Amino acid sequence: MIVGMEGIVERRDPTFIHLNVNGIIYEIQVSINTSNAIQEKRVKLFITQVIREDADLLFGFMDTNEKKMFDTVLKINGVGPKVGLAICSTFTPETFAKVVASKDVSMLKRVPGIGPKAASRILVELADFIVDGNAAEGSSGALGEAVMALESLGFKKDAIQKALSGCSGDTSTLVKEGLKKLQRL
């Protein structure tokens, strides 16, 4: 599973980039917010990989909160990567959390591909979606990356935070420590 990529931007469009990673050029789907945030030729993106029968798709994000938002909406029945990316292009994670908290169906219906029925389902299923302030602070650091890696392995966020409390070190050290502690929980 690919969780991150670093390389040189060969081509940039509003909804995708071509990223040269050691001579191999990948097409990575991005939100408009991520596309606008790319200012340098060399970038590091957090990746969600979606493997289907007919395609192997990469979705890239500059911000871990945006990646978390994308991954969360993908878990909702009837919401695919296209709609997930449209949500990420329409809202920042903070704005999306406010829309969900206020149960604002009309705001959610502004997203291309979301009608009243889908908007209601999203609001019901994401009632507890919050942008974690602590995760936002450490999202670019080792702790945020370790939490993201452990979540991608299927562990619950509460258990991960419990396991990583009091731990320090680089990302790989934190992931190893987290796995050891999570096996005991």
Curated annotation (Swiss-Prot):
Keyword DNA damage on entry: yes
Subcellular location: Cytoplasm
Region (Flexible linker): 139
Gene Ontology CC entries for this record: cytoplasm; Holliday junction helicase complex; Holliday junction resolvase complex
GO terms for biological process, alphabetical: DNA recombination; DNA repair
Record keywords, A-Z: Cytoplasm, DNA damage, DNA recombination, DNA repair, DNA-binding
Keyword Cell membrane applies: no
Region (Domain II): 63-139
Span list, region Domain III: 139-185
GO MF: ATP binding; four-way junction DNA binding; four-way junction helicase activity
InterPro entries linked: DNA_helicase_Holl-junc_RuvA_I (IPR013849), Hlx-hairpin-Hlx_DNA-bd_motif (IPR003583), NA-bd_OB-fold (IPR012340), RuvA (IPR000085), RuvA_2-like (IPR010994), RuvA_C (IPR011114), RuvA_C_sf (IPR036267)
Matches recorded under Gene3D superfamilies: 5' to 3' exonuclease, C-terminal subdomain, Nucleic acid-binding proteins
Chain intervals for the UniProt region annotation (Domain I): 1-62
Family statement drawn from the similarity comment of this UniProt entry: Belongs to the RuvA family.
Function: The RuvA-RuvB-RuvC complex processes Holliday junction (HJ) DNA during genetic recombination and DNA repair, while the RuvA-RuvB complex plays an important role in the rescue of blocked DNA replication forks via replication fork reversal (RFR). RuvA specifically binds to HJ cruciform DNA, conferring on it an open structure. The RuvB hexamer acts as an ATP-dependent pump, pulling dsDNA into and through the RuvAB complex. HJ branch migration allows RuvC to scan DNA until it finds its consensus sequence, where it cleaves and resolves the cruciform DNA.
Subunit structure, as described in the record: Homotetramer. Forms an RuvA(8)-RuvB(12)-Holliday junction (HJ) complex. HJ DNA is sandwiched between 2 RuvA tetramers; dsDNA enters through RuvA and exits via RuvB. An RuvB hexamer assembles on each DNA strand where it exits the tetramer. Each RuvB hexamer is contacted by two RuvA subunits (via domain III) on 2 adjacent RuvB subunits; this complex drives branch migration. In the full resolvosome a probable DNA-RuvA(4)-RuvB(12)-RuvC(2) complex forms which resolves the HJ.
Domain notes: Has three domains with a flexible linker between the domains II and III and assumes an 'L' shape. Domain III is highly mobile and contacts RuvB.
NCBIfam families xrefs: ruvA
HAMAP family xrefs: DNA_HJ_migration_RuvA
Name of the protein in question: Holliday junction branch migration complex subunit RuvA
Organism in which the protein naturally occurs: Sulfurovum sp. (strain NBC37-1)
Gene name linked to the record: ruvA
